[in-house]
Amino acid sequence: MISFSSFYQQIADSNLQHWLETLPSILGKWQRDHKHGNLPKWEKVLNKLHYPAPDQVDFVDSVTVGSGEQLSPGEKEKLENLLRLFMPWRKGPFHIHGIHIDTEWRSDWKWDRVKQHISPLKNRTVLDVGCGSGYHMWRMLGSGAKRVVGIDPSPLFLCQFEAVKRLAGPHHPVHLLPLGIEELPPLDAFDTVFSMGVLYHRRSPIDHLLQLRDQLRTGGELVLETLVIDGDENAVLVPQDRYGKMNNVWFIPSVAALMLWLKKCDFTDIRCVDTDVTALAEQRRTDWMPNESLVEYLDPNDITKTVEGYPAPKRATIIAIKNQPNQETVNG
């Protein structure tokens, strides 16, 4: 069974210690709720990942564990077969003992767009909301973060993350907890909070922004990356049914509308640092994710539109600072 005890020990004497009042029972319930699904099967695979400590790791320019020279061809083949049992791999890529996990998303491209605009992560405590299998968490660690906590309720993402961590070494201060942000108390403790690719999946985007704010210390930095449309501060797309074949897309605002929402939620120093139309090369079918991908979500005769006729995915990165909350505005 996946254990979270090392995380509990690490936060016992930190500014996250009050989380221990509720976290163990919440995670215990999550494990009980998933004991009859795929989780036990994936945990058996994790228990087979007994390999020597890697001769090198790189989280600065990539997520690389091992040089590829430690394992024999047979050992490498066995490891690859085990890692393939966690397919589909969506966020990456990862390089594990010479094995290239070519994920659906080139998450390294997103990181390259974001990292140049954020406050330095050195010695910061970081929260990554909707972290997937943890690719960006490793890159945050490589940027000098003191501790990185990711939350994502998916058991598959948890097991993919655990696979990489067990091969990289359990001592790294990076942790994935299978939670949604609505299960977090207001911690007011993180120096930087990332929410990338989450907002449009939330039925109440304002509530999501308030939940993100509640995790930041005053003066902490929010890094928000999400789908946007063109338009003024009143422009918001609400898909009638599906968007890019996804039935869980609720609100896609313009950059101006999103900045207004953040201001209403008592953020300050709000700025859009990047906009980017998702390229077909950034999200695509691979050997490690053989299902439909972006090309199938777009109009085959006009890739500037989704198959439903909406504008094709365009993403913006917004950075904002948590201001001292105005209780009358928030609660009034």
Curated annotation (Swiss-Prot):
Belongs to the class I-like SAM-binding methyltransferase superfamily. CmoB family. PANTHER family: METHYLTRANSFERASE (PTHR43464), TRNA U34 CARBOXYMETHYLTRANSFERASE (PTHR43464:SF95). Carboxy-S-adenosyl-L-methionine binds at K91, W105, K110, G130, D152, P153, S154, I181, E182, M196, Y200, R315. One of its GO terms (biological process) is tRNA wobble uridine modification. Pfam families: Methyltransf_9. GO terms for molecular function: methyltransferase activity; transferase activity, transferring alkyl or aryl (other than methyl) groups. This is tRNA U34 carboxymethyltransferase. SUPFAM superfamilies: S-adenosyl-L-methionine-dependent methyltransferases. Catalyzes carboxymethyl transfer from carboxy-S-adenosyl-L-methionine (Cx-SAM) to 5-hydroxyuridine (ho5U) to form 5-carboxymethoxyuridine (cmo5U) at position 34 in tRNAs. It catalyses: carboxy-S-adenosyl-L-methionine + 5-hydroxyuridine(34) in tRNA = 5-carboxymethoxyuridine(34) in tRNA + S-adenosyl-L-homocysteine + H(+). Homotetramer. It is an enzyme of class 2 (transferase). Keywords: Transferase, tRNA processing. Its EC number is 2.5.1.-.
